[in-house]
Amino acid sequence: TYNKFLNILIKKNFRFKKQKKEDNIYMPRLDTQIHGFIDWNWTAKHIVDFINAFGSPYQGATTFIKKKKYFLNNAKFFKNKINFHPFQSGIIFRKEKNSIYIAALGGTIKIKKVSDTISKEDRIVELKLGSRFFTPLKELERAKQLTSIHSSKGIFNK
């Protein structure tokens, strides 16, 4: 935590290590509303990591069922005996009271929270077995083309 880090600095128990230039990397900042769209062609593990990265305190990773936008949160990866075909990615194949299971490449994705643009309330109860989450290609392409700039005046995408 932040307090632990400060205590280490204050007690001078912190040793700085010079970083090698060849180890440096830079990744631009992201804007959830632009870059938070799920690519259902990815592996289940990559999708789970992506959903959780855009989860709380953010709105969640974005996708659609038909034309309705949903935000997925609280994802868990399961390796299973079923080897889903790529065409099955995004299909809700099991439902429980407070969660849904989605087919994906290399495993299953369990989601515990789904909200929409109207309400932050959980929408799992309204989702149907066999429904398919899908993200239009135009959203995925737009996410890769825009860079977010965060400043004191707000977030700008160029």
Report each predicted region and the residues it spans.
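Active-site-proximal loop/hinge segments within enzyme catalytic domains
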Residues: 1-78, 147-158
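Glycine-centered flexibility motif
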Residues: 35-36, 60, 87-90, 107, ...
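Short capping/connector residues at structural and topological boundaries
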Residues: 35-36, 43, 97, 114, ...
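Short acidic-hydrophobic surface loop/beta-edge motif
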Residues: 38, 61-65, 100-105, 127
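A short acidic-to-branched-hydrophobic micro-motif
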Residues: 64-83, 108-120
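Low-complexity, glycine/alanine/valine/leucine- and proline-rich hydrophobic stretches
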Residues: 78-109
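Generic C-terminus detector
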Residues: 105-158
